[in-house]
């Protein structure tokens, strides 16, 4: 009898696990839909899409960078987070301890192993945060689609995405998305931080990665699309753009076979990890005039 029960459990367990992951993936999709709707709320109010980073200069002359996660907070019923943030100080300073540790459910994918609040370490100097600085912050499993460097134009420039992140850059307008809202990614999964993961959701270690301005509520949280090697160890080392590395430059989700993206029309798609890098480039760029076919996806 015990042996029979053990066999039944072994047969049922995969089905139970699959059902649980389906529920988690559904919530992850819903999170991206809410973020996409918040982006349109921002667009309706401000006339442009949200910037990927907000830049302020303090009386000390220090340039501070804050994330789209703060810019969209009021449109996600998270005004308390926005109001608690002191934009005159960087995300790692004590003045922003309270705000940086406010965990926002919609920014966390339940399939991700990221804790609600995690310990981060800066891996190089940026925006007043020095290498080795340690701080605690709420984690974020989604990133803005900023640009693609997989295919450069004749001048060697990257293709612009819909969420501008260049310091001092201009935010994109509705009219600037000439490739079509349903063909252009706004946000995507980049889950698992601050731990660095490679293929098959295996933790890896690469010196200098990830830059921990990504993955937490006060950081940049954007993707400049570039191909990774299929072992997840080399940037610009191949054509893997889904689930090879979560240190920036590609999508990364903890769902079997792929990751989710939000499109500018508010819809969400699941992209397979076998997707071609050139197809991802088309989806990231907002005004390159590329043609997407059903076969591409």
Predicted feature descriptions by range:
Residues 2-14:
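Alpha-helical hydrophobic helix detector
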Residues 12-15, 19, 31:
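Extended, hydrophobic alpha-helical segments in both membrane/secreted and soluble proteins
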């Amino acid at each position: 009898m015990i042996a029979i029960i053990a066999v039944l459990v072994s047969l049922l367990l995969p089905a139970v696990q699959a059902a649980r992951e389906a529920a988690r993936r559904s919530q992850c999709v819903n999170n991206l839909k809410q973020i996409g709707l918040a982006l349109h709320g921002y667009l309706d109010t401000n006339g442009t899409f949200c910037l990927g980073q907000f830049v302020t200069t303090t009386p000390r002359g220090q340039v501070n960078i804050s994330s789209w996660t703060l810019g969209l907070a009021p449109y996600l019923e998270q005004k308390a987070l926005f109001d608690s943030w002191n934009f005159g100080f960087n995300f790692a300073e004590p003045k922003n301890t309270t705000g940086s540790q406010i965990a926002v459910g919609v920014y966390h994918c339940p399939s991700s192993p990221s804790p609600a609040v995690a310990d981060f370490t800066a891996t190089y100097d940026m925006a007043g945060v020095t290498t080795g600085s340690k701080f605690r912050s709420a984690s974020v499993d989604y990133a803005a689609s900023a640009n693609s460097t997989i295919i450069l134009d004749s001048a060697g420039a990257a293709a612009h995405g819909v969420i501008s992140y260049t310091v001092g850059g201009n935010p994109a307008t509705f009219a600037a998305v000439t490739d079509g809202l349903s063909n252009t990614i706004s946000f995507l999964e980049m889950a698992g931080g601050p731990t660095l993961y490679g293929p098959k959701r295996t933790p890896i270690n690469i010196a200098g990665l990830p830059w921990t301005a990504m993955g937490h509520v006060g950081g940049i949280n954007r993707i400049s699309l570039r191909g990774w090697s299929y072992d997840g160890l080399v940037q610009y080392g191949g054509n893997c753009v889904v689930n090879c590395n979560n240190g920036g430059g590609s999508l990364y989700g903890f769902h079997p076979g792929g990751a989710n993206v939000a499109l500018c029309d508010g819809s969400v798609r699941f992209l397979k990890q076998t997707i071609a890098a050139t197809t991802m480039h088309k989806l990231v760029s907002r005004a390159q005039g590329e043609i997407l076919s059903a076969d591409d996806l």
